[in-house]
Amino acid sequence: MAAKDVKFGNDARVKMLRGVNVLADAVKVTLGPKGRNVVLDKSFGAPTITKDGVSVAREIELEDKFENMGAQMVKEVASKANDAAGDGTTTATVLAQSIITEGLKAVAAGMNPMDLKRGIDKAVIAAVEELKKQSVPCSDFKAIAQVGTISANSDETVGKLIAEAMEKVGKEGVITVEEGTGLQDELDVVEGMQFDRGYLSPYFINKPETGSIELESPFILLADKKISNIREMLPVLEAVAKAGKPLLIIAEDVEGEALATLVVNTMRGIVKVAAVKAPGFGDRRKAMLQDIATLTAGTVISEEIGLELEKATLEDLGQAKRVVINKDTTIIIDGVGDEVAIQGRVTQIRQQIEDATSDYDKEKLQERVAKLAGGVAVIKVGAATEVEMKEKKARVEDALHATRAAVEEGVVAGGGVALIRAAASISVSGLKGDNEDQNVGIKVALRAMESPLRQIVINAGEEASVIANTVKAGEGSYGYNAYTEEYGDMIAMGILDPTKVTRSALQYAASIAGLMITTECMVTDLPKGDAPDLGAGGMGGMGGMGGMM
């Protein structure tokens, strides 16, 4: 086991604070509408330019191991805030730095660290309640666009695109962000159910100019099995041919003789058929086939429930107004499924989302809800260069997360005003701890709540103390707009922060800061020295062996 370097008390805390400050100082320059960019060097390719706090935090590793421990703990604050609300990473870092700095000063002055932490926790619990009281619902187009704009660093185009996307696919809908091909940002909405499976044979293509298959009012056969024998399908194919409609086959796979026969019949014009693989794998595939069945009023032909392909009739087939299939995707538009049955299926999946533990499962279930309930929106980000494209895409993703958070828990006045009002309410209510050290902890937390506003003002090149005092003297959502450099009602000016983002930033900052204030010892590996020289010089002693003769 490697030897360890151990530091105690103030020595440990000073080193840790130095690391905290390096990381926080790098991150906080990005805060606010006039925040600056940070350039990140990459081992290959062009440097990345970003205003995203968590991207900056993730890049920072310090040489000194004790300082690095401090930096990594604050990195955790940014990362947790990002995971919870998708935004507020810089605010969380600024709050953590302030609480840690003030808290360690109090520890150095002889306060009890555990009581300080308890005081900080009390203040944060009270502040979260105040934020909930201030919160107003965010449901209309204008408010959603404003939240998106603020989170995308005052880019109005992005705010409007996100609001449009939410309007078209619903607040539960799937909205994805992709790199576009032009200079302009674009919004593509795919109505109906889309899944990532393309045609099984290019010979099914009936629109050569677009390389796609279009089926008007097709029957849809859903089979939870591999189809390799055409005999199984003959009864269904004959019934479909008599009905004079096209047929889409969605199965685990269609192969060999079955696929060849379908291709030949399609090319001869006997029956119009297309085949695709079912989406997903294992249990997820079964569930998604059932989703398609609900959407198209069909039945999944599965031997598990005693249904056989040979006995399938037209009543077992689903129907839709139109189906479009290309090399990679299939879109089913306007399935004829019963609205009540579809809503029941959506409710069932939403219950599964609540019960799901992994983020991956939740995301996949959310996608299924969106596909059943309305569609998928894709925001295509446009930019002149790849460097700008990457930076902008990260901003749009942040804005999208923030907007979802706003719809979920409502919004509060932005620009750091909500935290200042929360701190003022706590001061007026006279929140007290069990002893004097806890009271100091409460004051540390309340003072930290001013730090986001101060940092926004500093980044705008103004005098922080003057503006902070003016805002504190106001009431409600009265604050300072750093973008236009004027005072006014923040909500009326459209400067809004999602309640969830502000709440998460404060809670995670206080959590990690509390742990750091109560740190008394730090242990790390000693740097490995040069390995001793194990040369063969010692063999010279063998010269004396001549006397053995």
UniProtKB/Swiss-Prot annotation:
Entry-linked CDD domains: GroEL
Assembly mode: Forms a cylinder of 14 subunits composed of two heptameric rings stacked back-to-back. Interacts with the co-chaperonin GroES.
EC number assigned by the record: 5.6.1.7
Top-level enzyme category: isomerase
InterPro entries: Chaperonin_Cpn60_CS, Cpn60/GroEL, Cpn60/GroEL/TCP-1, GroEL-like_apical_dom_sf, GROEL-like_equatorial_sf, TCP-1-like_intermed_sf
NCBIfam families hit by this protein: GroEL (TIGR02348), PRK00013.1 (NF000592), PRK12849.1 (NF009487), PRK12850.1 (NF009488), PRK12851.1 (NF009489)
Superkingdom, taxonomy of origin: Bacteria
Keyword field contains Nucleotide-binding: yes
Subcellular location: Cytoplasm
Recorded catalytic activity of this chain's protein: ATP + H2O + a folded polypeptide = ADP + phosphate + an unfolded polypeptide
MF GO annotations: ATP binding; ATP-dependent protein folding chaperone; isomerase activity; unfolded protein binding
PANTHER family assigned: 60 KDA HEAT SHOCK PROTEIN, MITOCHONDRIAL
Any single biological process term in GO: protein refolding
UniProt function note: Together with its co-chaperonin GroES, plays an essential role in assisting protein folding. The GroEL-GroES system forms a nano-cage that allows encapsulation of the non-native substrate proteins and provides a physical environment optimized to promote and accelerate protein folding.
Name recorded for this polypeptide: Chaperonin GroEL
Keywords: ATP-binding, Chaperone, Cytoplasm, Isomerase, Nucleotide-binding
Gene3D superfamilies: GroEL (3.50.7.10), GroEL-like equatorial domain (1.10.560.10), TCP-1-like chaperonin intermediate domain (3.30.260.10)
UniProt-annotated binding residues for ATP: T30, L31, G32, P33, K51, D87, G88, T89, T90, T91, G415, D497
GO cellular component: cytoplasm
Gene, per the UniProt record: groEL
Family as reported in the entry's similarity comment: Belongs to the chaperonin (HSP60) family.
